[in-house]
Amino acid sequence: MSKNKLVAYAVSMLVVMNQLSGCSTLEKPVENKTVAPPQFEPFIRLSDEAFGFVGSLRRPTDRVLGSTVLIGSNVALTAAHCLIDSDISYVEFAGNKYEIDYTVCYEVGSYRNHDIGLVFLTQDVIGVDPVGRVDDVLGSIKKWDYVTTIGYSRGFKKASSLSTFRYYGVLYNEENQIKMLPNRGSIWFGDSGGGLFWFGDNGFELIGIIVSFSKMEGFIVENSSIRVDCYEGWIDYEIEKNKLLNSQTE
């Protein structure tokens, strides 16, 4: 048998033996490598359409001035300090611009004790359902419950991760404010007027309007929101007054 035939025969026998034995080409062993744990992200970037009931207050330059939360077809809550002596031009919900009819603050001309205000629009917001509100924060939420913020700090929309904020409670002489403890993340400029939310028996509901953070020795130690349930009577009164005004102009 010629040399070439012997080589071909040997190769064919190896192929047959490999098929019969079910073996395959051995791969080079890979060394075990320690996989780094996933990095904790305190906030999740959102599209403008996600949680569409949280919108933004915009300057004439289209830059974000603050945040706002839709609670009725044409009315939104925000922080009063975003409305007083500001250059707010329009409101944006789910990427759509809406003209402002007028604004009103609980504490006229000031926000020192009651940093909450309402923004009334010239038309209803389209394609966005207003968010529900918790009517009894103290009776519903327990200390250390997870709470979620949604706002427009740093110019884009974001929601806090599940474990970023815990509900701490309400302090004496500041009963209209909710204190939440930040974990490796904090609200920031631009989040003001946005929402603090809690997931309860009625689903995802608004409990507060974001207003401030406090620093101690260079570190942010707590974040504050205005309790919406403390202002239910005022909110309902202003909404009814707006409906009456609109009915008179029709």
What are these model-derived regions, one by one?
Residues 27-49, 60-63, 84-127, 131-139, ...:
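Conserved catalytic-core segment of clan PA serine endopeptidases
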